[in-house]
Amino acid sequence: LDDELTISAPAVNGGPADDYDNRADPPSWFGRYRDPAMTPLEFKALEWLDGFYELEHLLATRQWAMKLRPQASPELCLAALVHDAERYFPGGPTNTPSRFDDPSYLFAHSIRSAEFVDSFLAEIPGVHDEFRYQVRCLVLRHEVGGGTEADVLQAADSLSFLETLPWLTVEWVQTGRYPVEMAMAKHHYMLTRMRPAEAMEYGLPLYEQAISQLKNAAAVPLDGRRQVASDFRLLLGLRGTDDV
């Protein structure tokens, strides 16, 4: 990646997000994902996906990747931040697969995401072909792993799902998209597919909390939760909560 990359991003300060909860009041979420190490290209990627309901999940995936692999490459950090990009754009594979481990769905989702990400990077001045290739490879493998950083990305995706998306599986149950047993199965799948041993240690408490919520899904308040999850400026602490 060239030093002359001409994308500006505001400086942010802070550390990892605090414990996950369902509160949707903006002040409690302000700046949870601040990171002074975020690059201009990463910030540009967030702008590209502005309003995507998975932005919190993507930010948390990047955090988990860096926690699992402190020497994470720039390619891994960016891939973590864009791995589900295709869901932002209409026309993708169904978001209601009958099985969460269905390779046909997982590969279609991963390939489509990689294509969108590669096209995005192709338009950015200063991004080298090798960087694009490595990011594409990681996005292609984010559901199945394969190689050290791909395994880290898969585990980071799982940990982030368990941490930040229980509200989504509760929403599935509340809206009738999936029965509670299927929602629980999604969390179980995300937990058990992880390879790094330390990821399982981090994941078990998150899994137990998510299952506990699903057992009482009808009573879980979700007002405003999707909006918070879609607002990267709020999550990075880049603007006041009065603007929400």
Where do the model's predicted regions map?
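Divalent metal-dependent phosphate-bond-processing catalytic cores, especially two-metal-ion Mg2+/Mn2+ enzymes
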Residues: 7, 14-15, 19-32, 47-73, ...
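Short, structured loop/turn "capping" segments at alpha-beta junctions
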Residues: 128-132, 146-147
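An active-site-proximal "capping" alpha-helix that borders the catalytic cofactor pocket
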Residues: 61-64, 108-123
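Secondary-structure capping and boundary motifs in well-ordered enzyme cores
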Residues: 69, 74, 105-109
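Active-site flanking loop/helix segments enriched in acidic
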Residues: 27, 31-62, 88-106
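Inter-helical turn/loop segments and adjacent helix faces that build the functional surface
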Residues: 123-129, 173
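Extreme N-terminal basic, low-complexity initiation segments
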Residues: 2-8
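His-Asp-centered metal-binding catalytic motifs of divalent-metal-dependent phosphohydrolases/nucleases
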Residues: 74-98, 113, 117, 133-144, ...
